[in-house]
Amino acid sequence: MATIGYIRVSTIDQNIDLQRNALTSANCDRIFEDRISGKIANRPGLKRALKYVNKGDTLVVWKLDRLGRSVKNLVALISELHERGAHFHSLTDSIDTSSAMGRFFFHVMSAPAEMERELIVERTLAGLAAARAQGRLGGHPRAINRHEQEQISRLLEKGHPRQQLAIIFGIGVSTLYRYFPASRIKKRMN
């Protein structure tokens, strides 16, 4: 059961000593760090720390905002730790998910994020139902309509190159192959 520390400062110029001293005092076995904004999703130090964390271990940060800026991301990260059987501890915020009170606080904190996810799903389903009621189907609009499909089919059968047709119809060559696989095109002999 290791204690893994994570330090993050927003710029290279910021001093990490305060965080490092706090994590050292918390008896962290290993400390990982990033010198990057919390808004940036790709944080190599955090990735290494999360890879290092095993079941029964605890990820420790000096302050909650060092781990992430949005509640949604924090909830996802702490949930991932929980699913792996690991714990989370924020020193200055007094959050420790290894205790009943810490887990309770985490659940209270995660409730708004869960509600937001459910509201998004409800709005999406309501929008799709309204569209269906008006005769529209959900999803992306087709890249080419039926009339264009018929035109392209005739042109392909006459031997026109896909690259040329892609330019004319303003679509990608891969779209042409998706709609008209090479095995289905019969070239007419004139």
Curated annotation (Swiss-Prot):
The active site is at 10 (o-(5'-phospho-dna)-serine intermediate). Residues 2-135 form the Resolvase/invertase-type recombinase catalytic domain. One of its GO terms (molecular function) is DNA binding. Residues 162-181 bind DNA. Gene3D superfamilies: Homeodomain-like (1.10.10.60), Resolvase, N-terminal catalytic domain (3.40.50.1390). The keyword Aminoacyl-tRNA synthetase does not apply. It comes from the Bacteria. Pfam families: HTH_7, Resolvase. One of its GO terms (biological process) is DNA integration. Keywords: DNA integration, DNA invertase, DNA recombination, DNA-binding. A DNA fragment of approximately 900 base pairs, adjacent to the fljB (H2) gene, which specifies the synthesis of phase-2 flagellin, can exist in either orientation with respect to fljB. The orientation of the inversion region controls expression of fljB. The hin gene occupies about two-thirds of the inversion region; it is required for the inversion of the fljB controlling region. Belongs to the site-specific recombinase resolvase family. This is DNA-invertase. It comes from Salmonella abortus-equi. The lineage of its organism: Bacteria, Pseudomonadati, Pseudomonadota, Gammaproteobacteria, Enterobacterales.
